[in-house]
Swiss-Prot record:
Residues that bind phosphoenolpyruvate: R298, R334, N458, D459, R469
GO biological process, one term: phosphoenolpyruvate-dependent sugar phosphotransferase system
Catalytic activity: L-histidyl-[protein] + phosphoenolpyruvate = N(pros)-phospho-L-histidyl-[protein] + pyruvate
Source organism phylogeny: Bacteria, Bacillati, Bacillota, Bacilli, Lactobacillales
Domain notes: The N-terminal domain contains the HPr binding site, the central domain the pyrophosphate/phosphate carrier histidine, and the C-terminal domain the pyruvate binding site.
Keywords: Cytoplasm, Kinase, Magnesium, Metal-binding, Phosphotransferase system, Sugar transport, Transferase, Transport
Protein name (Swiss-Prot/TrEMBL): Phosphoenolpyruvate-protein phosphotransferase
Length: 577
């Protein structure tokens, strides 16, 4: 029987294939009293080691196929496996209660999950709860000798159907066979959606109950552009979906022709399209997709991939490789953004109730705790500056004095290197990431002293709306097109231009096809996004008239009170079909 479902369009693409139901195994067990607690601890250690080996392999595959940024979630999982407090409590429970490892594991991890989930004002801890649940399931499966579903074994064209996909599930998908996936829960900003876009496979999330409606082998049609899903479609519907897929493939082929084209609007106005990267090897994707710059190089992955602080020489080689790989095109390097959801096992930071609003990023760099680490990074960057067009960006800036202090340290290290006879470029732009509302509101003062702004909308929207974008209960508040967000962006861009500086954007909003016309109208100079979004955005921009987009933006800023009103207004100016 044919059934039609509507979900959240999370990743573009159209596919028709057999359903592959990703069923979670039965992990029920009985609590058993034991006398040999040492043997139970040994069983636990073996399961922990097997899980660690498994996750390390999955992480490496994720790095190879998705890049460092997408793979970073597995660092959090590996840290859970190595958490001495939690592992210690599990072993203590085995010894004191004389129960099997399965029972002790569940008791302790359930306690931690409940504790973190109840921290409703702390999205960081709520995310850690999800990590613990995922890791505990893996360890329990090893204790029970049960195999977890392995999407890597899929060897024919399939549509993966699941209640949800964990990061470890998504990292194992082979885009040669998995043409799309559909889940009961999730949204555009969930880990699985982001990974689907990186893999360039269609995804529709949040269908509520597709796992109850689909059997293995059913034919499923998925449109990741519209969010439409059909179970056991008719021949006519299959033909319709295949035609839509061919149209999309044709579009992609047309976009590919724009690889070496300049990014100009229909009336000849140029905008810079840049790409975000996490490692030097991501530069290949930047160039293959025709980006004009690297708009955000997230340097924290250098630290997260090391067993100790990366040395000045190690960092220099990485920065040099990126600058040389870009052949003189601009490279915006963000100084390390450690803290929040990015922890380093070798860097002992104080535990905080809310790390996202705590001691992180530039706050660490300019403190006594992180000063030497910051100076090492700046020296490496300055040495590498002679190999290309370097731009240095400081993250998580709230106060002008924070920028001044960081800039002062940069100037000190520049003078030190010159005194040592080391060549340093004298043409390095220094800017800040605008992700805190306080900095956005004071952009007119910052603009007098910085060389550029890059608006980090992922955090700016969260902080402005007081809503965690990964929390489904409040995800409706994550509104890039809300007039309040558009007004903040407009204020920052105007402040930059008033001082003759440029303003860019490096959050997901920069590559959002609905947001781009509004941002063109506001006058944003640079758009930095995932490399795979560059050509599509260039194609869109070629159809836009800046005068009309300025009119659209002005009306959105002055006439609209809600996101819905902005979207309705945009329909008067843009036909997205």
């Amino acid at each position: 029987m044919t059934e039609m479902l509507k979900g959240i369009a999370a990743s573009d693409g159209v596919a028709v294939a057999k359903a592959y139901l990703l069923v979670q195994p039965d992990l029920t067990f009985e609590t058993v009293s034991v006398t040999d607690t040492q043997a139970e601890e040994a069983r636990l250690d073996a399961a922990l080691e097997a899980s660690q080996n498994e996750l390390s392999l999955i992480r490496q595959k994720a790095v190879d196929t998705l890049g460092e940024e997408a793979a970073a979630v597995f660092d959090a999982h590996l840290m859970v496996l190595a958490d001495p407090e939690m592992i210690g409590q599990i072993k203590e429970t085995i010894r004191t209660k004389e129960v099997n490892a399965e029972s002790a594991l569940k008791e302790v991890t359930d306690m931690f999950v409940t504790l973190f989930e109840n921290m409703e004002d702390n999205p960081y801890m709520q995310e850690r709860a999800a990590d613990i649940r995922d890791v505990a399931k893996r360890v329990l499966a090893h204790l029970l000798g049960v195999e977890l579903p392995n999407p890597a074994t899929i060897s024919e064209e399939s549509i993966v159907i699941a209640h949800d996909l964990t990061p470890s599930d998504t990292a194992q998908l082979d885009a040669n066979y998995v043409k799309a996936f559909v889940t009961n829960i999730g949204g555009r900003t969930s880990h699985s959606a982001i990974m689907a876009r990186t893999l360039e496979i269609a995804a529709v999330l949040g269908t509520n109950d597709i796992t109850e409606r689909v059997k293995n082998g059913d034919i499923v049609a998925v449109n990741g552009i519209t969010g439409q899903v059909i179970i056991n479609p008719t021949e006519d519907q299959i033909a319709e979906f295949k035609a839509a897929g061919e149209t999309y493939a044709k579009q992609k082929a047309e976009w590919a022709l724009l690889k070496d084209a300049e990014t100009v609007t229909a009336d000849g106005k140029h905008f810079e399209l840049a790409a975000n990267i996490g490692t030097p090897k991501d530069v290949e994707g930047v160039n293959n997709n025709g980006a004009e710059a690297v708009g955000l190089y997230r340097t924290e992955f250098l630290y997260m991939d090391s067993q100790d602080f990366p040395t000045e020489d190690e960092q220099y080689e990485a920065y040099k490789a990126v600058l040389e790989g870009m052949n003189g095109k601009p490279v915006v390097v963000r100084t390390m953004d450690i803290g929040g959801d990015k922890e380093l096992p070798y860097f002992d930071l104080p535990k905080e109730m809310n790390p996202f609003l705590g001691f992180r990023a530039l706050r660490i760099s300019i403190s006594e705790t992180g000063n030497q680490m910051f100076r090492t990074q700046l020296r490496a960057l300055l040495r590498a500056s002679v190999h290309g067009q370097l731009r240095i960006m400081f993250p998580m800036v709230a106060l002008l004095n924070e920028f001044r202090k960081a800039k002062g340290i940069l100037e000190e290290e520049k003078a030190n290197l010159k005194a040592e006879g080391v060549a340093v470029s004298d043409d390095i732009q220094v800017g800040i990431m605008i992700e805190i509302p306080a900095a956005a509101m004071l952009a007119d003062q910052f603009a007098k002293e910085v060389d550029f702004f890059s608006i980090g909308t992922n955090d700016l929207i969260q902080y402005t709306m007081a809503a965690d974008r990964m929390n489904e209960q409040v995800s409706y508040l994550y509104q890039p097109y809300n007039p309040s967000i558009l007004r903040l962006v407009d204020h920052v861009v105007k402040a930059a231009h008033a001082e003759g500086k440029w303003a860019g954007m490096c959050g997901e909003m920069a590559g959002d096809q609905t947001a781009v016309p509004l941002l063109v109208g506001i006058g944003l100079d640079e758009f930095s996004m995932s490399a795979t979004s560059v050509l599509r955005t260039r194609s869109l921009m070629k159809k836009l008239d800046t005068d009309k987009m300025q009119e659209l933006a002005q009306r959105a800023l002055t006439e609209c009170a809600t996101m819905e009103e902005v979207l309705e207004l945009e329909k008067e100016y843009i036909d997205f079909d």
